[in-house]
Amino acid sequence: MASSSSSLLILAVACFVSLISPAISQQACKSQNLNSAGPFDSCEDLPVLNSYLHYTYNSSNSSLSVAFVATPSQANGGWVAWAINPTGTKMAGSQAFLAYRSGGGAAPVVKTYNISSYSSLVEGKLAFDFWNLRAESLSGGRIAIFTTVKVPAGADSVNQVWQIGGNVTNGRPGVHPFGPDNLGSHRVLSFTEDAAPGSAPSPGSAPAPGTSGSTTPGTAAGGPGNAGSLTRNVNFGVNLGILVLLGSIFIF
């Protein structure tokens, strides 16, 4: 009788685990409310800095609409930034959108920066066209940057860089921290179904500067490109455990 009760208990636990496993593997970005923004086709939990990217690729005009969500490193006066690097994989050469709160309950200010070197952070035009640029304050102290950028025709991925920083003085952002996460906040963003997750775009010449509009080893381990593999591994491990438990019931 005791053996039968133990078997039933094990079976009940196994069924419970199988039911909750999809919730365990679900991406956090899918539950985010982006206020007035429409739905995006895809989203990624970026691997560092508690940051998220929502995006939609439009092949008809080679554009990428994005919403970048992050929390500044300081509750008051901090900034967040998302960039595309047409010529490399890290910060130098990045074409960045940077947002910060100006105070008084107003919407965050968002500016563009052409980052020519690690020691230079000067506001200026970007090397590609963009439009519909804006920023919003979200719950939990987060800031969201929205924009649509022009990407090269036929491209299936871009090098994205993101960052969070501290104080902003007279509209000029301060230096960001130099911890491992801050230095590792760059990944390849593959935005078409045919893109190979591990292949980084080859650095080349930046496109000719466009007009700004009005007012996201290849992908490293643990990065956005491996999210699907992680989910599959979690579910496979759970299902294998269930099979082992069920087998033990019938054997004993």
Swiss-Prot record:
GO molecular function: metal ion binding
Glycosylated residues in this chain: N58, N61, N114, N167
UniProt induction comment: Induced between 4 and 8 hours after treatment with auxin and remains high for at least 24 hours.
Listed GO CC annotations: plasma membrane; side of membrane
Binding site for heme: M91, H176
InterPro entries: AIR12_DOMON, DOMON_domain
Record's keyword terms, sorted: Auxin signaling pathway, Cell membrane, Electron transport, Glycoprotein, GPI-anchor, Heme, Iron, Lipoprotein, Membrane, Metal-binding, Signal, Transport
One BP annotation, GO: auxin-activated signaling pathway
Biased composition (Low complexity): 195-219
Segments passing through the bilayer: none
Signal peptide feature range: 1-25
Cofactor(s) the protein requires to work: heme
Start and end residues of each DOMON domain: 49-165
Propeptide, chain numbering: 227-252
Lipidation (GPI-anchor amidated asparagine): N226
Free-text function comment from the UniProt entry: One-heme-containing cytochrome.
Name assigned to this protein: Auxin-induced in root cultures protein 12
Taxonomic source organism: Arabidopsis thaliana (Mouse-ear cress)
